[in-house]
Amino acid sequence: MPEIQEFLNQGLPNRVRINHALEHATLHVLQEKGIAGRLGGISDAGGFWIYGDVATETLLLGAQEALKRLAEGESALAVHPNCGTNLAVGSLAAGGLAWMGMRGTKGKMSRRLARLPIAILMGIIGYQLAKPLGPKIQEQVTTNADVSGMELVQVLRHDVASGITIHRVSTRMTR
């Protein structure tokens, strides 16, 4: 489907994909540096947000290193095991196969209950089959490790209610 790939590689979708790759790479670098705790992120065309307890300077240094390493060709950093893409792919596969297992059960409750173990088994099979698919979809669709022309603009810390810390990592494309 070359037209889909062409769409993904231009303008707004491409900027989101590149920032998504940098977000993942930053999380990998922070993990390598032993930053403990739960961190998460979300990307958009102007950068990404990091949720969790990390010092602003540490995050900045991690993002700088991540950008450098992606630019040097470490494209594997763009794929992250905890990405929501993996969850979405697994959920769709599990739900889709479980739904197929329940097809044709309209009517009696006893018929539905009899089919329930099959639906559960099909859901588990779907989830397991989808595990290698999530990272592949990250690599091909939701991230782009080509960071040429990208620069970090700033990292801003926001302390929100209940002691939650979020950071905005802003980027800019120069090409």
PLM features per residue range, with description:
Residues 22, 35-39, 43-51, 119, ...:
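Cytosol/matrix-facing juxtamembrane amphipathic
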